[in-house]
Amino acid sequence: MTELPPYWLRDNCPCAECRDPRNGQKLFQIDDLPEGLAVAGSTEADGHLEVLWSDGHRSRYPLEWLDRADEGDGRTERGKRLWTAADFAPGIPRARWEDYLADPAEQAAVLAAVRDSGFAVLRGVPAVERQVLRVAESFGYVRVTNYGELFDVRVEPDPNNLAFTSVAIAPHTDNPYRDPVPTLQLLHCLENSATGGDSGLVDGFKAAAILREEAPDAFEVLTRTPVPFVFRDRRTELRADRPLIDVDPRGRIREVRFNNRSIGTVRADDPKDLDAFYAAYRRFAAITLRPELQLTFRLGPGDCLVFDNTRLMHARTAFQQDGHRHLQGCYADLDSLNSTLAVLHRRAAALDAIAALFAGEGAGEYLGEEVTMAEHMLQAAAAAEAAGAPEHLVAAALLHDIGHFHGALHGRDLMEGQDNRHSDSGADWLARWFGPEVTEPVRLHVAAKRYLCAVEPGYREQLSEASEYTLSVQGGPMDERQAAAFAELPGARDAVAVRRWDEQAKVAGAPTPGFEHYRPLLAALMR
């Protein structure tokens, strides 16, 4: 491991001195590192590589991170599902809007479909104007263009775009004349009673991959020839010179811009280059029109199509004006969608880790009580719920003793006479995902016991034998000055409430909901 380039290894030091724990941003400049930086020593322990540097700094790297392959930014063909229409014979990626809003797992599945397959359809979005903006805002931000924050796709008397007519539209990407191009497009169907007007999608990455396989020279021409995409009307003049197929430095397909209507005059010093471009352009266009690549479906009122505008080409069949066809659309960007998806996955992983504690260590003895640790915390949460407590206090009651599993000392150490300060270690661990409205009652719930024993006559007599013992280890009842100071703390009242539920939650065999009952509540509180 120590054969790794030293400046690369040190530049990626994850310690709090080198990176802000809240956001991972570096706290030093690369030229702050000394000349001749070298590894002075290293050891492997507990799944980590520990490095002592020649300047005295110490770093600790997870071995799993050192072995991890380059993930990229998720924008290239790597890891994507390149598809033909037959791949969706069982059905296209879709979900109910109400389920998407209510269930983080359902939202993650929809966003992952857009990332991996390039699109998804939400069903049951209210068929009223401007709802498409709400869909975009559910995962990101609306991209405003010269068409406004949203646009209507219907027949216009004086259209400035073929989209606003009833004619058929061949597969294309939108706004190729804009740099950066809007990377996501949303189309929400309000009405579709006309004959025709079916929607179509083509996987541009798949078409480009076919071209690369069948005619690699043509593929290479389209990756290196700048194409002027232009748009103008009375108020707008836009141009972007980009290749039809854009690849990353490793040669992986990253973006397709394809819109015959918007291509301006391609120029080259050598006419042979123009011949090569047009031969490649025509071949690529023919591939996009192959029947096996054409996925056709009909949007009904309430359907909202979300798709990757840097990958998928969308199309429309002609329609008759014997009925009405009205869609509203808007643009958004993949960075927000990918960010939201990553956060959803991060939260799900955190909830899985907490659930594993309840099912694993939580199934063990709870400090000499007649219930397990998990039963105790679930009973506390159930008591909070029964009392009509706000969600953040139900969460605090559920998680108040999570610190017994973290920190230098375990819960068993507390019973052996060492204060494991589980309220602090638990709050610190939970602070990675929850705000102070959850973590501070957790942090203060031990102090709340000491406070109540000092100020509330008869409270101490209610303590169980184990709780009485831990009280002595944790400092005993507060004195008058300590109690007054505690009462002034911002989270004191909530901590006292959690403490009362804590003391109630020691009944052997009491029925309670399981951890999964509280997962949606916790997910809604995570940040």
Which residues does each predicted region cover?
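Short secondary-structure capping/junction motifs at helix and strand boundaries
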Residues: 58-60, 119-123, 144-148, 435-443, ...
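Aromatic/His-enriched, Gly/Pro-containing loop or helix-boundary segments
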Residues: 27, 31-38, 155-160, 165, ...
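Metal-dependent phosphohydrolase cores
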Residues: 347-527
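Motif-centric detector for short Cys/His coordination patterns
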Residues: 2-103, 112
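Active-site environment of non-heme Fe oxygenases that use a 2-His-1-carboxylate facial triad
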Residues: 71, 76-119, 124-306, 310-346
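Short, solvent-exposed loop/edge-beta patches enriched in aromatic
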Residues: 45-47, 57, 115-116, 385-391
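Residue-level detector of functionally special positions within alpha-helical transmembrane segments
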Residues: 22-30, 118, 172, 309, ...
